[in-house]
Regions:
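Short S/T/G/P-rich N-terminal loop/turn motif that feeds into the first structured element of a domain
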Residues: 1-68, 79-96
Length: 96
């Protein structure tokens, strides 16, 4: 079952994009992330959401245990403050 992790925090879209690009450069093929999307709340400027997609919950947990992910998480906390996580099992996807 596919799994999505939503990260919600305050910062700039540019900083969030740079953070993901740095993670991609460092993690390379080690990461289990399949897709990452950065979104900015139109109604609350500076409020960001990152939608991180995995093939499964198990892959997400493996990814969370990687040293590169732990380091990136520490850097994100120092850059963006508290990050709120939502952990979602994908039940169905509809392509329109």
């Amino acid at each position: 079952m596919k799994f999505i992790q939503i990260m919600e925090f305050t910062g700039s879209a540019e900083e969030a994009i740079n953070s993901i690009n740095n993670y991609i450069d460092i993690a390379g093929e080690e990461t289990k992330v399949k897709k990452a999307t950065v979104c900015e709340d139109r109604d609350t400027p500076g409020r960001l959401l990152q939608v991180i997609e995995f093939d499964s919950y198990e892959d997400a947990m493996i990814n969370n245990d990687l040293e590169v992910t732990k380091k990136a998480s520490e850097e994100d906390t120092s850059s963006f403050g508290d990050v709120e996580f939502k952990n979602l099992n994908v039940v169905e996807v509809f392509e329109m």
